Amino acid sequence: MPNPWTGTGNPYTRSEVIERLNDTLSKGQAIIAAGAGTGISAKFIEKGGADLIIIYNSGRFRMMGHGSTAGMMAYGDANAIAMEIGEYEVLPVVNEVPVICGVHATDPRRRMWHWLGKVKEMGFSGVNNFPTHTIVDGHFRGVLEETGMSVQKEYEMVALGRKMDLFSIVYVGSPEEAAEMAKAGADAIIAHVGTTVGGSIGVTNAVVSWDDTIRRTQAIIDAAKSVRDDIFYLCHGGPINTPEDADRVIQATDCVGFVGASSLERMGVEESLTNLTREFKKIPLERKK
C-alpha cells in the first residue's frame, strides 16, 4: 500500500513502484521519469503525468542557471543537497508519484547503510546513483577506481537498497556497468549517453551521434538482459532532448521509457519563461494625456 500513515503517496515499497511502472506499460505508455530541482518543478511534473520523480543535486544547479555537470563537481554536499530538496521542497508537494533520491554512493564520509536508512525514513521510495562515476572516463576515472572511490561502491549501494526494500533506478555508461548493476539488483537501468544538448547551458559539441546513441543504448540493454530479464530500460542524455527524440530511441531499441532532467525541467523553464516574457513585452503603451 502507499504511505501507511496517510494512506496516499510516498513512501512506496519497491514492489509497489514496480507494479505502478508495469501498469504504465500495460496501458501502452512509455515510462517517463523526470529530474526535479525545486518543488514547483516537481509539482507540475506530477501534474503532467510523470511516472517517477528523481531528486539529485544537479537539479539545484540547473535551477540556479548552471550546467548539470556542476553536480559532478565539489560545489557542495551532493547527498545533503538531495535530501534537503526532498524534505523541504519536493516531498511536501508531490501527492502520488514515487519520489527517488539521488545518492552519491562513493562519499567516503558516510556509512551507506546508515545513509540509506535516512533516505528511507525521509519518505523516498527509491534511490538513484547520482552523482555517478559511470559517466567519468579517462585518467581521472582510473584515479577514482584506484583510490577508494570506485564505481563498485555504486553497485554496493544498489545492493543495499534492494535489501532495504528501496526501488533502484540507476545510470550506467557501458555494457560492463549495466551487467554489474543487474547483478547488484537494480530495478531500472538508464543508458546514459552523455550530457544533454540544447538550451542555454546544454552541450553543443561534446555529444555523440544518433547512430552511436542507439548502438550504445542497445548494447547496455543487451548486457543487462544477459544477467536478468526483469529490468526496466530507459534512455537518457546526449542528443535526446525532445519527446520526438525519446520516441526515436525507444522505437529503435528495447527501451521502454525516458529519463528527462535538463530536457524536461530546464528546457521547460527556458522556453516558457522566454516566450511568456516576450508576450508581455508586446503590450503597447500610448502616452496618457
PLM-predicted stretches and their roles:
Residues 2-5, 41, 48, 52, ...:
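Active-site beta->alpha loop and helix N-cap motifs at the rims of alpha/beta catalytic domains
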